[in-house]
Amino acid sequence: MRKAVVQFDDVRQAFDTKNGAITAIDSASFDIGRHEFIAVLGPSGCGKSTLLRLVAGLIQPTAGAVKVYDRRVDGPRDDIGIVFQKPTLLPWLDVTANVTFPMLHKFGRVTVTETDEARRLLKVVGLSDFGSKSIDQLSGGMQQRVAIARALLLNPDILLMDEPFSALDALTREEMSFELLRIWCTSPKTVLFITHAIPEALLLADRIIVMTPRPGRVREIIDVPFPRPRSLATLSEPRFNELANHIREQLFAPGLVHA
């Protein structure tokens, strides 16, 4: 059994609003093993992105504990990379400079070694010929690849991905899912991947955490049975559709958490 890298121990997260406190997450307990790819599925407002923010140290839990490497998360960490829904790139910098920007921001300079590593990562994400291009010359999918390369530059142990392909069209989204699979196989990371797309979760993940509507509770944790490497043929397997239908039933089922 893989050693737990990320642990949620009976976590509750509430937010104060003008109409009173709202509980986003309640009684969430699960862990993520080293180099495990975990996808989180759930309806809008169930706290999926809140889980990610807790691991990132951007917020602190109202109750319970979130741990990384057996230590409570009390703030942002250098060993965690984040890819958001939108790539948030800097249009006045070229592609390579966007990838190396975290180094410039943190240390005030970018070394030759870091620039070389940025070029290597651009090759990994399929953009080796675009390093000198401006951001506005790239498609949405290409911009998200730049964001992934940027997140990988610091060589994080843990990669948090908050619906990174949600703004893309269906074909580009599928292409990016396979691209992410290839990158993950080349450079394994512990991944927490937030998504609304059931096929995307089944294609990418080792396990899927299915959340209830708000307050978000863990309804079920599903082991994904398909061997790696996965391919287009995986999408056509009968078991794939069976699991997709099962997850839909869980997402729309009444009731609370499964014991």
Question: Model-derived features: where do they sit?
Answer:
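ABC-type ATPase nucleotide-binding domains, specifically the catalytic core motifs of the NBD
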Residues: 16-18, 93, 97-114, 124
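The feature captures the beta-strand-to-loop junction immediately N-terminal to the Walker
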Residues: 41-43
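Helix-to-loop junction immediately C-terminal to a conserved catalytic motif
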Residues: 56
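Conserved ABC transporter NBD signature motif
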Residues: 64-76
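Conserved ABC ATPase "signature" region
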Residues: 112-130, 182
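A short, proline-enriched helix->beta-strand linker immediately N-terminal to the Walker B motif
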Residues: 153-157
